[in-house]
């Protein structure tokens, strides 16, 4: 192929991700011209409502898939945490690339750590996952929704609308904003979203030529971890509308997976772990999902607003 076109959201972070993949592809295939097709998704347009109320993860993906289906693009670059658990017919995930830091970051102009915040402090977050963990572990804090791209969220903090905000560390680091991070939340303190920090590349199903060109970008360890995490989310119906997190780590051919399901107000918080062979990550994810279901996860999920 002489030309490859990458479909991407137009936010600064999404464009960084697309440019990163473009640069890697140019290194791998210097004979090939690689372009980026910037697009605005519905998730980028609706900024006054929390993601959990407007449909969740697929909001950042669908327009890119339309471009793929129409042949306007050959691949789409996503943050894996935004990719729905089931792709529509006609598409496949060709690559799960090497992961940036998967943890959540604490950002504040006044405090060094989440545990330093006094009662009544206002914390901004965009996700039910972070909100549920905050409410469960820090019930004395006030949690308020925070939408917009990374720059917008930081601006709202700097304007004094929040005492602190929580963001994905990966996004801040990729944008060169790592200095804004006051501290990183341990996985025990804030279990990340499935796939957080990893990039995924989606293509049209059966496009073997593009799949072969992308193959060197796949990171087997990250892919195994993310597949296990996504299986937990798949079994439990995870989306932006479900307070759920899962994080896997790899050691000596084994996966250690931790995850939780909670009520949004943190009043019920179920957490567990599973371990298994990295060669079958879905089985490890299924084992953790089964443990959470045995604790009563289904009742928690069924009680969530539709």
UniProtKB/Swiss-Prot annotation:
Pathway: Porphyrin-containing compound metabolism; protoporphyrin-IX biosynthesis; coproporphyrinogen-III from 5-aminolevulinate: step 2/4. One of its GO terms (molecular function) is hydroxymethylbilane synthase activity. It holds the Pfam family Porphobil_deamC. Tetrapolymerization of the monopyrrole PBG into the hydroxymethylbilane pre-uroporphyrinogen in several discrete steps. The gene is hemC. The porphobilinogen subunits are added to the dipyrromethane group. Monomer. It is an enzyme of class 2 (transferase). The modification S-(dipyrrolylmethanemethyl)cysteine is found at residue 240. The keyword Nuclease does not apply. GO terms for biological process: protoporphyrinogen IX biosynthetic process. Keywords: Porphyrin biosynthesis, Transferase. Binds 1 dipyrromethane group covalently. It comes from Thiobacillus denitrificans (strain ATCC 25259 / T1). Gene3D superfamilies: Periplasmic binding protein-like II, Porphobilinogen deaminase, C-terminal domain. One of its GO terms (cellular component) is cytoplasm. The lineage of its organism: Bacteria, Pseudomonadati, Pseudomonadota, Betaproteobacteria, Nitrosomonadales. This is Porphobilinogen deaminase.
């Amino acid at each position: 192929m002489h030309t490859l076109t990458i479909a991407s959201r137009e936010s600064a972070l999404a464009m960084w991700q697309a440019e990163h993949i473009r640069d890697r592809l140019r290194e791998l295939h210097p004979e090939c011209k690689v372009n980026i097709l910037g697009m605005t998704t519905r998730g980028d347009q609706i900024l006054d409502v929390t993601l959990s109320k407007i449909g969740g993860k697929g909001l950042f993906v669908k327009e890119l898939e339309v471009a793929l289906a129409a042949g306007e693009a050959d691949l789409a670059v996503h943050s894996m945490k935004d990719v729905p658990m089931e792709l529509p017919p006609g598409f496949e995930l060709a690559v799960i690339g090497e992961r940036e830091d998967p943890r959540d970051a604490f950002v504040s102009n006044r405090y060094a750590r989440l545990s330093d915040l006094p009662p009544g402090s206002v914390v901004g977050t965009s996700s039910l996952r972070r909100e549920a963990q905050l409410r469960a572990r820090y019930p004395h804090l006030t949690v308020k929704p925070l939408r917009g791209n990374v720059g917008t969220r930081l601006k709202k903090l700097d304007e004094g609308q929040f005492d602190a905000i929580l963001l994905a560390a990966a996004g801040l680091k990729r944008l060169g904003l790592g200095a804004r991070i006051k501290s990183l939340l341990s996985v025990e303190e804030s279990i990340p979203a499935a796939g957080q920090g990893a990039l995924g590349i989606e293509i049209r199903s059966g496009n073997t030529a593009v799949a072969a060109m992308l193959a060197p970008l796949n990171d087997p360890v990250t892919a195994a971890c993310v597949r296990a995490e996504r299986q937990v989310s798949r079994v439990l119906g995870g989306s932006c509308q479900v307070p759920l997190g899962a994080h896997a780590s790899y050691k000596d051919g084994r996966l250690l997976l931790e995850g939780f399901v909670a009520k949004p107000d943190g009043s019920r918080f179920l957490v567990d772990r599973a371990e298994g062979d990295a060669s079958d990550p879905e089985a490890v994810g299924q084992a953790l999902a089964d443990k959470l279901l045995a604790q009563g996860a289904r009742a928690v999920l069924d009680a969530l607003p539709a």
